């Protein structure tokens, strides 16, 4: 299984990450507040320049993270789906097309939510339906991520069953699930059980250690809130074909040498989970 790492703050380190042993990068598009920049004419060339630096280092784009509106902020506009779509849909359509231009076919997304389960689902069904033609045109899979809302609360997108509602509704090769292990833990969900429930619908991972009520983005095995060996074994059991993608953050203020040591440790941990088991 390929091992990948999110690209936040690592732009100069791509050759070093390849040397450590990483196979790919989880490419994060800019934050929601940069809408004008994303929709500008020169945005594509800027993104593709970064992609070329990654490719020149011998790394692939394992998956992307589409621009999202953070769940802890006040809702966009009046909080209705119409306001969310008006702001986000043009961004998402452009980024899906760019994903394919980076030779990647997997895009994680944070869906819309509000207090009402029915209205949340109604809005998201509209959103995905409007994204489907572009997803199909470019051969990109939309991987719906489990997320939380204000105060780490439930937003009808926290469980495997929440994600499978959309996968089962569309029954499309272009709609799957992204399991964020840290988000699962903070919502007191078991990532091992989530993998088993998602099965073949699981297309992407955001792997990181966490504890309930936080979003720490530490390497796997650093916090014992998950049986990581069982987690990896569950991935194999369901036939997961994506990358073991770690969405981790080095402590702020580290030197480049220390940052690389952090990523070397993380890669070694991931690799150790994949070692053949000794026969008893």
Short names for language-model regions:
Residues 26, 63, 108, 143, ...:
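Conserved beta-strand positions in the central sheet of alpha/beta enzyme cores
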Residues 56, 71-176:
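Active-site acidic/histidine proton-transfer and metal-coordination neighborhood
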Residues 1-4, 9-21, 89, 97, ...:
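Histidine-acidic metal/acid-base catalytic patches
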Residues 9-11, 29-31, 67-70, 111-115, ...:
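Active-site-proximal loop/turn and secondary-structure-junction residues that shape catalytic pockets
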Residues 28-54, 115:
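Glycine-rich, proline-tolerant flexible connector loops at the mouths of alpha/beta enzymes
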Residues 1, 63-78:
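N-terminal small/glycine-rich loop or linker at the start of catalytic domains
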Residues 33-37, 72-77, 115-118, 150-153, ...:
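A short acidic, helix-capping loop that chelates divalent metal ions and anchors anionic groups
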Residues 50-64:
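Glycine-rich, aromatic-flanked loop segments that form ligand/cofactor-binding clefts
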């Amino acid at each position: 299984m390929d091992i990948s790492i999110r690209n936040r703050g690592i732009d100069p380190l791509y050759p070093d990450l390849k040397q450590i042993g990483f196979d790919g990068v989880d490419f994060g598009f800019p934050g929601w507040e940069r809408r004008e920049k994303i929709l500008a004419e020169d945005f594509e060339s800027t993104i593709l320049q970064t992609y070329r630096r990654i490719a020149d280092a011998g790394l692939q784009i394992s998956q992307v993270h589409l621009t999202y509106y953070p769940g802890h902020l006040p809702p966009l506009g009046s909080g209705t789906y119409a306001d969310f779509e008006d702001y986000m849909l043009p961004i998402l359509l452009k980024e899906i097309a760019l994903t394919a231009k980076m030779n990647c076919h997997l895009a994680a997304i944070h869906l819309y939510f509000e207090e009402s389960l029915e209205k949340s689902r109604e809005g998201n069904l509209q959103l995905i339906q409007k994204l489907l033609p572009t997803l199909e045109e470019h051969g990109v899979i939309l991987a719906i991520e489990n997320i939380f809302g204000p105060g780490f609360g439930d937003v009808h997108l926290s469980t495997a069953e929440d994600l499978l509602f959309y996968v089962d509704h569309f029954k499309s090769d272009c709609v799957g699930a992204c399991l964020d292990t840290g988000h699962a833990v903070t919502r007191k969900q078991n990532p091992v059980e989530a993998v088993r429930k998602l099965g073949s619908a699981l297309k992407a991972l955001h792997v990181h250690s966490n504890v309930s009520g936080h979003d720490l983005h530490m390497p796997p095995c650093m916090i014992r809130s998950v049986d990581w060996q069982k987690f990896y074994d569950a991935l194999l059991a369901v036939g997961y074909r994506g990358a073991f993608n770690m969405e981790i953050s080095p402590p702020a203020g580290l030197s480049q040498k220390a940052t690389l040591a952090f990523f070397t440790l993380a890669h070694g941990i991931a690799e150790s989970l994949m070692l053949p088991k000794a026969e008893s």
